[in-house]
Structure formats: structure tokens, C-alpha cells
């Protein structure tokens, strides 16, 4: 009879904030291995900004309740040519971060360059390259949607020890989850 060894897995929720569509991706990190758990999008309807921000906040809380992550990785805002778009994206990002922090999760931030470098090996990679590498790294049958792929890429970046900023947005740390795996010996 083989004995079982205990492996501690860390569940990471990656978020790619957007006012219309916020991508989410959930992975488990077991040692050096990554395992896909889930991904999808939180969509807001056209309408008043406060209602859309509430949809994002509630959506993140629902994802956290469904998948119980230990940590959260969020892509930082890039400065757009259009200042109004940048402000709206910043507000959406704030709602997403508040959703995670209100669930007592530590939030780590990464630039798009850091995420692409960690996943593709090139900081200026195209979205299609990110999608393809996410599919390969997580052994997915098909390519995830661009928003979900970006969120999964953010989670992968964090899992690979990306140098995100956890300072001001850190909630209380959660312990990893315990999984039992058969002893290979």
C-alpha cells in the first residue's frame, strides 16, 4: 500500500479589469506545477457608472465565494491616449480590487509588461501570443477568450513569482489548501 504525501496548493485568482468586461482566471499552484481551475468574464450592462461598478464589485465577490482563492493578482492600469477612458478603467479597477479586499484577500499588482514577460517571455507580446501560451501552460483544449486569457496570464505571472506590488492593498494572508497525493515511491 502506498502512503500519501501532503502537497500544499495555493489558489490564485487573476483579474483583468475592464468597465465592460472584466476577465477572471483561477489556477492552483502545486510546487512548480500549475493547474487550471476556472475562467470567465464579468460583464456589465450599459448604464450609469455606479451601477456598473457595483456589478464588478459583486461579480468579484461571487467568483471569490465560488472558487475560494488564497491570493489575487490584478493587472495595473496603463495610461491611455484618452484620459476619460483611463479614468473609467481606473474606477473599474478600484471596484475589482475592493471586491477582493472586502473578502480579506491579499492583492498583488502587475504591469502588462510583467505579465507578458512572465507568460510569453517577451514584454510586448500580442494578445494572440498570450492566449496561445496560456493555453499551452495550462494544457487547455482551446484558447480562452482574450479577457479570460489575460486574467489567467496575470495569475500565472504571480505564480511564477512576479514582482508585483502587494503593499497598500494586502488583506490578511490565507493559508494554502491541503491536497493529498499518492507517494511516488
Swiss-Prot record:
Where does the record say this protein resides? Cytoplasm
Q: Name one GO cellular component term.
A: cytoplasm
Instruction: Identify the EC number(s).
Output: 3.1.21.10
Q: Where is the active site?
A: 16, 75, 147
Top-level taxonomic group: Bacteria
Query: What keywords would UniProt list here?
Result: Cytoplasm, DNA damage, DNA recombination, DNA repair, DNA-binding, Endonuclease, Hydrolase, Magnesium, Metal-binding, Nuclease
Q: What is its main location?
A: cytoplasm
Transmembrane spans: none
If you read the UniProt record, what top EC class would you report for this enzyme, in one word? hydrolase
Question: Cofactor: bound how, per the entry note?
Answer: Binds 2 Mg(2+) ion per subunit.
Q: Write one Gene Ontology MF term.
A: DNA binding
User: What are the binding positions for Mg(2+) 2 in this chain?
Assistant: 75
Q: Which HAMAP family match?
A: RuvC
Question: What does this gene product do?
Answer: The RuvA-RuvB-RuvC complex processes Holliday junction (HJ) DNA during genetic recombination and DNA repair. Endonuclease that resolves HJ intermediates. Cleaves cruciform DNA by making single-stranded nicks across the HJ at symmetrical positions within the homologous arms, yielding a 5'-phosphate and a 3'-hydroxyl group; requires a central core of homology in the junction. The consensus cleavage sequence is 5'-(A/T)TT(C/G)-3'. Cleavage occurs on the 3'-side of the TT dinucleotide at the point of strand exchange.
In the record, the note on similarity to other proteins reads: Belongs to the RuvC family.
NCBIfam families named in the record: ruvC (TIGR00228)
Name by which UniProt lists this protein: Crossover junction endodeoxyribonuclease RuvC
Q: Which gene encodes it?
A: ruvC
